[in-house]
C-alpha cells in the first residue's frame, strides 16, 4: 500500500469522530462550564459568609438581650422617680402631654440682636425707619384730669359746650337740627377712632382748624355721654339698694311670721296636753 492509501483511512476515522462529537456536543466545553459554575458558587458562598461575619461583629446577638434588660431597668428607675405627685405632674406635662410651643420669631429674637451686635452689623430687616422715626413729645394729660374731675362733680354748663364753658377753649359748635341730633351723635361716636389715628402734622391751617373743632365737639359729646352713664349708674345703684332693703324686710317679716306660727302651735299643743286627763 502506498502512503496515500494509509492516510485516507486515518482521515476518515478523524472525520467520523468529529461527526460523532457534533451530534452529542463538545465534552471539553462542558467541563469548562462546570468549572466556572463551581467558582461562582464558591465566590457566592464566601461573600455571604463575609457579610454574615461582618453583621455578627457589628450586631452581636447577645447585645439585644442586654438592651432589653437595660430598658426594663430604666423604666423601673423612672417609675421610682415619678412616684411622688410633683415629679409625676412635671413628667406628665413635659412628656406625656403635647406642649403648646410658641412659634419662634427670628426677627424679634434676642439671639438675632446679640448676633448682629457681635458681628457689628446694622439691623435693616424689619426695622427700617426706626432710626429715622420722628420723636414725639409725651402728651400732657392735665386737661384729661381736669375733665375727669369736672365730670365727677357733674356741674351743668350754661351753653352745654363743656370745653368752652370750663376751659375757655374757642371752637365752632356743631350745627345740627334737634331731630337729627341722635343720628349725628351716633356717626360722631363711630368716627372718634379715626380722629385719634389722624396725622395732623401734615395738615394745612384750614384742615387743622377743622380737625380741632371736630375734636372739641367729640370731647363735648363724650363728656355728655359719660355724665348720662354716670347718672344711669347712680340710678341703678339706688334701685339695687332699694331692692336689697325690700328683700331684707321681706325675709325678716317671713321669719317673724314663721316664729309666730311655731309659738301658736306649741301653745295649742301644751294646752291640749294639760287638759288631756279630763276625758278619762
UniProtKB/Swiss-Prot annotation:
Keyword flag Transferase: no
Q: Which InterPro entries match?
A: YBL010C/LAA2-like
What broad class describes the main subcellular location of this protein? cytoplasm
Locate the region Disordered.
1-26
- Which keywords describe this protein according to UniProt? Cytoplasmic vesicle, Protein transport, Transport
Q: What is known of its domains?
A: The ear-binding motif (EBM) is required for the interaction with the clathrin-coated vesicle and its recruitment to clathrin-coated vesicles.
Disruption-associated phenotype: Leads to a severe defect in clathrin-associated adapter complex AP-1 localization. Causes increases in the calcofluor white (CFW) sensitivity in cells lacking CHS6.
Q: How does it assemble?
A: Interacts with the clathrin-associated adapter complex AP-1. Interacts with LAA1.
**What's this chain's function?**
Involved in localization of clathrin-associated adapter complex (AP-1) and subsequent AP-1-mediated clathrin-coated vesicle cargo loading. Directly mediates the interaction between LAA1 and AP-1 which is required for AP-1 localization. In complex with LAA1, cooperates with the small GTPase ARF1 and the phosphatidyl-inositol-4-phosphate (PI4P) synthesis to confer temporal specificity to AP-1 recruitment.
Give any extra note attached to this record: Present with 1320 molecules/cell in log phase SD medium.
Q: Localized where?
A: Cytoplasmic vesicle, Clathrin-coated vesicle
The cellular component terms of Gene Ontology attached to this UniProt record, alphabetical and capped at eight, are: clathrin-coated vesicle
Q: Which gene encodes it?
A: LAA2
Q: What is this protein called?
A: Clathrin adapter accessory protein LAA2
| GO biological process per UniProt | clathrin-coated vesicle cargo loading, AP-1-mediated; protein transport; protein-containing complex localization
Motif residue range(s): Ear-binding motif: 19-30
Amino acid at each position: 500500500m502506498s502512503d496515500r492509501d494509509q492516510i485516507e483511512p486515518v482521515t476518515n476515522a478523524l472525520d467520523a469522530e468529529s461527526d460523532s462529537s457534533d451530534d452529542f456536543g463538545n465534552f471539553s466545553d462542558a467541563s469548562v462550564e462546570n468549572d466556572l459554575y463551581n467558582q461562582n458558587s464558591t465566590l457566592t458562598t464566601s461573600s455571604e459568609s463575609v457579610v454574615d461575619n461582618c453583621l455578627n461583629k457589628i450586631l452581636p446577638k447577645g447585645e439585644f438581650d442586654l438592651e432589653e434588660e437595660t430598658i426594663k431597668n430604666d423604666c423601673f428607675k423612672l417609675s421610682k422617680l415619678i412616684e411622688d405627685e410633683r415629679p409625676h405632674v412635671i413628667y406628665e406635662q413635659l412628656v406625656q402631654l403635647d406642649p403648646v410651643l410658641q412659634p419662634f420669631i427670628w426677627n424679634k429674637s434676642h439671639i438675632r440682636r446679640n448676633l448682629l451686635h457681635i458681628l457689628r452689623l446694622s439691623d435693616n430687616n424689619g426695622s427700617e425707619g426706626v432710626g429715622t422715626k420722628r420723636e414725639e413729645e409725651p402728651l400732657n394729660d392735665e386737661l384729661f384730669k381736669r375733665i375727669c374731675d369736672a365730670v365727677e362733680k357733674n356741674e351743668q354748663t350754661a351753653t352745654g359746650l363743656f370745653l368752652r364753658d370750663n376751659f375757655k377753649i374757642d371752637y365752632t359748635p356743631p350745627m345740627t337740627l334737634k331731630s337729627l341730633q341722635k343720628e349725628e351723635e351716633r356717626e360722631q361716636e363711630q368716627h372718634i377712632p379715626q380722629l385719634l389715628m389722624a396725622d395732623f402734622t401734615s395738615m394745612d391751617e384750614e384742615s387743622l382748624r377743622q380737625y380741632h373743632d371736630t375734636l372739641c365737639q367729640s370731647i363735648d359729646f363724650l363728656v355728655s355721654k359719660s355724665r348720662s352713664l354716670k347718672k344711669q349708674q347712680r340710678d341703678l345703684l339706688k334701685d339695687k339698694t332699694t331692692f336689697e332693703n325690700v328683700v331684707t324686710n321681706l325675709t325678716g317679716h317671713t321669719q317673724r311670721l314663721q316664729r309666730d306660727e311655731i309659738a301658736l302651735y306649741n301653745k295649742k299643743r301644751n294646752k291640749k296636753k294639760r287638759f288631756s286627763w279630763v276625758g278619762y
